[in-house]
From Swiss-Prot:
It is a single-pass membrane protein. PANTHER family: ANKYRIN REPEAT DOMAIN-CONTAINING PROTEIN 39, ANKYRIN REPEAT DOMAIN-CONTAINING PROTEIN 39-RELATED. ANK repeats lie at residues 11-40, 44-74, 77-103, 107-138. The chain crosses the membrane at residues 195-215. The lineage of its organism: Eukaryota, Metazoa, Chordata, Craniata, Vertebrata. Coiled coil: none annotated. Pfam families: Ank_2 (PF12796). This is Ankyrin repeat domain-containing protein 46. Its main location: membrane. GO terms for cellular component: membrane. Keywords: ANK repeat, Membrane, Repeat, Transmembrane, Transmembrane helix. InterPro entries: Ankyrin_rpt, Ankyrin_rpt-contain_sf. It comes from the Eukaryota.
Length: 228
């Protein structure tokens, strides 16, 4: 069975709904252009989109959507148009326009559950199963991404609080970073061996100044020997 039979909707006194049941695209378009409400319902709360989707008439579904039909509308049992679908192209159209594949009616049944009960063809079942699997994977990825975002925000907040509580530390890190950058630029400009030679000359000058001031050579034991 490829669509849902609705006993009290097989004949209706609402022209637009009857046109959707009959699959009459031309008459449906004429009625919509004349101002008919695209969301008008039958006695069970079904809209034209429900009835067209149940019969796999994707052209009328697209027409109704163009004129403002609500793809999320539910009947009095909580069924969306997707719950009544039994055709691949109609399912793809509804899902691409915002209907969730895992949405439940008032009895807790998803479109996949109802499709299996109706015994629709295997291609439709496989499509619904694939869409449900993608929905679950997307939810898991979204949850993981949100957790990572929260953890990053908490880490940044903690670092900011630490910096506010320790302004001297933040200032010291800035000075150290500036000194390191300046030293690297100095070494690159002068050359490693020249810098090494300069350090050696400075060290020797320091030793000479120390001897001149104190009269004592550094690193030399200048204690007077014992007089015998």
């Amino acid at each position: 069975m490829s669509y849902v039979f609705v006993n009290d909707s097989s004949q209706t006194n609402v022209p637009l709904l009857q046109a959707c049941i009959d699959g009459d695209f031309t008459y449906s378009k004429r009625l919509l252009e004349s101002g008919f409400d695209p969301n008008i319902r039958d006695s069970r709360g079904r809209t034209g989109l429900h009835l067209a989707a149940a019969r796999g008439n994707v052209d009328i579904c697209q027409l109704l959507h163009k004129f403002g039909a609500d793809p999320l509308a539910t009947d009095y049992q909580g069924n969306t148009a997707l719950h009544l679908c039994g055709h691949v192209d109609t399912i793809q159209f509804l899902v691409s326009n915002g209907l969730k594949i895992d949405i439940c009616n008032h009895q807790g049944a998803t479109p996949l559950v109802l499709a299996k009960r109706r015994g629709v063809n295997k291609d439709v079942i496989r499509l619904l199963e694939s869409l449900e699997e993608q929905e679950v994977k997307g939810f898991n990825r979204g949850t993981h991404s949100k957790l990572e975002t929260m953890q990053t925000a908490e880490s940044e907040s903690a670092m900011e609080s630490h910096s506010l509580l320790n302004p001297n530390l933040q200032q010291g890190e800035g000075v150290l970073s500036s000194f390191r950058t300046t030293w690297q630029e100095f070494v690159e400009d002068l050359g490693f061996w020249r810098v090494l030679l300069l350090i050696l000359v400075i060290a020797l000058l320091s030793l000479g100044i120390a001897y001149y001031v104190s009269g004592v050579l550094p690193f030399v034991d200048n204690q007077p020997g014992l007089v015998h």
